[in-house]
Swiss-Prot record:
Family: Belongs to the elongation factor P family.
Major subcellular site: cytoplasm
UniProt superkingdom: Bacteria
Subcellular location: Cytoplasm
Official protein name in the record: Elongation factor P
MF terms in GO: translation elongation factor activity
GO BP terms, alphabetized: peptide biosynthetic process
Record-level GO cellular component terms: cytoplasm
Keywords: Cytoplasm, Elongation factor, Protein biosynthesis
Pathway assignment: Protein biosynthesis; polypeptide chain elongation
SUPFAM superfamilies linked: Nucleic acid-binding proteins, Translation proteins SH3-like domain
Function: Involved in peptide bond synthesis. Stimulates efficient translation and peptide-bond synthesis on native or reconstituted 70S ribosomes in vitro. Probably functions indirectly by altering the affinity of the ribosome for aminoacyl-tRNA, thus increasing their reactivity as acceptors for peptidyl transferase.
Length: 185
């Protein structure tokens, strides 16, 4: 058992038999009353995000989650296949386990897979990835005084807004947390 002072971003808590990862936390010491910890938790299995408050010093159950360096190989009909770089085992994850990370997975993409009791839980992507633009309309600056954007389809099939000067084949850097264009690669 651990206490609420051990809660940090990314820590996995076992609450009522469900694994939840801490997205945000805040230690609050009000002028009146006792201190408490306000958290935002994401259920690993369902993806549901909930707010939960713990009294300061309360006991919580921290779960050991192993992080494996992996490479994305391919997608078949019902799963995504990754290769563990330590022992070259193949790991299969369902679409719900991969979730929105599927928008940024290209062949041989390096990722981290979180596992609990040797069962894969979810995919952790790097903060940004480099992807190629496969389709976009030609951009026309025309009479704009400020830069504009246009839709572009990436090699993964994901569509984002990019500046007008981006053309088909351009490799761009995309923020995996927001899905926004960062810059040319």
């Amino acid at each position: 058992m651990a206490s609420t002072s051990d809660i940090r971003n990314g820590v996995v808590l076992n609450i009522n038999g469900q694994l939840n990862t801490v997205i945000e936390f805040q230690h609050v010491k009000p002028g009146k009353g006792g201190a408490f910890v306000r958290t935002k938790l994401k259920n690993i299995l369902t993806g549901k995000v909930v707010d939960k408050t713990f009294n300061a010093g309360a006991s919580v159950v921290l779960e050991n989650v192993d992080r494996r360096d992996c490479t994305y190989l391919y997608r078949d009909a019902d799963s995504f296949v990754f290769m563990d770089l330590a022992d070259y085992d193949q790991i299969r994850l369902t679409a719900s386990q991969v979730a929105s990370a599927a928008n940024y997975l290209s062949d041989n993409q390096k990722v981290v897979i979180a596992t609990h009791n040797n069962a894969p839980l979810y995919v952790d992507l790097p903060p940004s990835v480099v992807l190629a633009v496969t389709h976009t309309e030609p951009g026309v600056q025309a009479d704009r005084s400020t830069g504009g954007t246009k839709p572009a389809t990436l090699e993964t099939g994901y569509q984002i807004q990019v500046p007008l000067f981006i053309t088909v084949g351009t490799r761009i850097r995309v923020d995996t947390r927001t899905g926004a264009y960062i810059g040319k690669a």
